[in-house]
UniProtKB/Swiss-Prot annotation:
It comes from Aedes aegypti. The gene is npf. Residues 56-65 have a biased composition (Basic residues). Residues 54-90 are annotated as: Disordered. The modification Phenylalanine amide is found at F63. It is found in: Secreted. One of its GO terms (cellular component) is extracellular region. This is Neuropeptide F. An integral part of the sensory system that mediates food signaling, providing the neural basis for the regulation of food response; coordinates larval foraging and social behavior changes during development. May have a hormonal role in females. The keyword Signal applies.
Length: 90
Protein backbone atom coordinates (compact mmCIF):
# COMPACT_ATOMS: atom_id res chain seq x y z
CA UNK A 1 0.00 0.00 0.00
CA UNK A 2 2.90 2.35 0.61
CA UNK A 3 3.95 2.11 -3.03
CA UNK A 4 0.55 3.15 -4.41
CA UNK A 5 0.31 6.05 -1.95
CA UNK A 6 3.66 7.50 -3.00
CA UNK A 7 2.78 6.94 -6.66
CA UNK A 8 -0.50 8.78 -6.18
CA UNK A 9 1.29 11.60 -4.36
CA UNK A 10 3.88 11.96 -7.12
CA UNK A 11 1.14 12.06 -9.77
CA UNK A 12 -0.70 14.77 -7.83
CA UNK A 13 2.51 16.72 -7.39
CA UNK A 14 3.25 16.41 -11.09
CA UNK A 15 -0.25 17.59 -12.03
CA UNK A 16 0.00 20.50 -9.58
CA UNK A 17 3.36 21.49 -11.04
CA UNK A 18 1.93 21.31 -14.55
CA UNK A 19 -1.06 23.48 -13.60
CA UNK A 20 1.19 26.07 -11.94
CA UNK A 21 3.46 26.15 -14.98
CA UNK A 22 0.51 26.65 -17.32
CA UNK A 23 -0.92 29.45 -15.16
CA UNK A 24 2.40 31.27 -15.12
CA UNK A 25 2.77 30.81 -18.87
CA UNK A 26 -0.76 32.00 -19.63
CA UNK A 27 -0.39 35.03 -17.37
CA UNK A 28 2.43 36.31 -19.57
CA UNK A 29 0.05 36.61 -22.54
CA UNK A 30 -1.73 39.58 -20.98
CA UNK A 31 1.33 41.80 -21.52
CA UNK A 32 1.49 40.99 -25.24
CA UNK A 33 -1.59 42.96 -26.24
CA UNK A 34 -0.90 46.08 -28.29
CA UNK A 35 -1.51 49.45 -26.75
CA UNK A 36 -3.52 52.11 -28.55
CA UNK A 37 -1.47 54.84 -26.94
CA UNK A 38 -0.41 57.39 -29.61
CA UNK A 39 2.99 57.82 -28.01
CA UNK A 40 3.73 54.10 -28.28
CA UNK A 41 2.70 54.14 -31.95
CA UNK A 42 4.95 57.13 -32.60
CA UNK A 43 7.78 55.39 -30.74
CA UNK A 44 7.33 52.26 -32.86
CA UNK A 45 7.40 54.31 -36.07
CA UNK A 46 10.54 56.10 -34.91
CA UNK A 47 12.25 52.79 -34.11
CA UNK A 48 11.31 51.36 -37.50
CA UNK A 49 12.69 54.44 -39.28
CA UNK A 50 15.91 54.16 -37.29
CA UNK A 51 16.18 50.49 -38.18
CA UNK A 52 15.63 51.29 -41.85
CA UNK A 53 18.39 53.91 -41.90
CA UNK A 54 20.83 51.58 -40.13
CA UNK A 55 20.01 48.82 -42.59
CA UNK A 56 20.54 51.18 -45.52
CA UNK A 57 23.95 52.18 -44.13
CA UNK A 58 25.20 48.65 -43.48
CA UNK A 59 23.56 46.58 -46.21
CA UNK A 60 25.72 46.09 -49.26
CA UNK A 61 24.78 44.82 -52.69
CA UNK A 62 26.22 41.46 -53.64
CA UNK A 63 28.53 42.50 -56.48
CA UNK A 64 31.21 40.04 -57.47
CA UNK A 65 29.67 37.05 -55.73
CA UNK A 66 28.40 35.36 -58.87
CA UNK A 67 30.28 33.35 -61.47
CA UNK A 68 31.16 34.54 -64.97
CA UNK A 69 29.08 31.96 -66.82
CA UNK A 70 26.89 34.65 -68.34
CA UNK A 71 28.09 38.13 -67.40
CA UNK A 72 25.35 39.98 -69.32
CA UNK A 73 22.69 38.01 -67.45
CA UNK A 74 24.16 38.97 -64.08
CA UNK A 75 24.63 42.64 -64.91
CA UNK A 76 28.41 42.47 -65.34
CA UNK A 77 30.26 44.91 -67.52
CA UNK A 78 29.66 44.07 -71.18
CA UNK A 79 32.95 45.67 -72.21
CA UNK A 80 34.90 42.75 -70.79
CA UNK A 81 35.21 40.65 -73.92
CA UNK A 82 37.98 38.54 -72.46
CA UNK A 83 35.78 36.79 -69.84
CA UNK A 84 35.65 33.72 -72.09
CA UNK A 85 39.43 33.63 -72.50
CA UNK A 86 40.91 30.69 -70.57
CA UNK A 87 43.98 32.76 -69.59
CA UNK A 88 41.88 35.58 -68.21
CA UNK A 89 41.98 35.82 -64.42
CA UNK A 90 40.81 38.38 -61.95
Amino acid sequence: MTFSTSSSFSRRALVALLVCTLLIDLSSFTDARPQDDPTSVAEAIRLLQELETKHAQHARPRFGKRSYLNPAGYGQDEQEDDWQDSTFTR
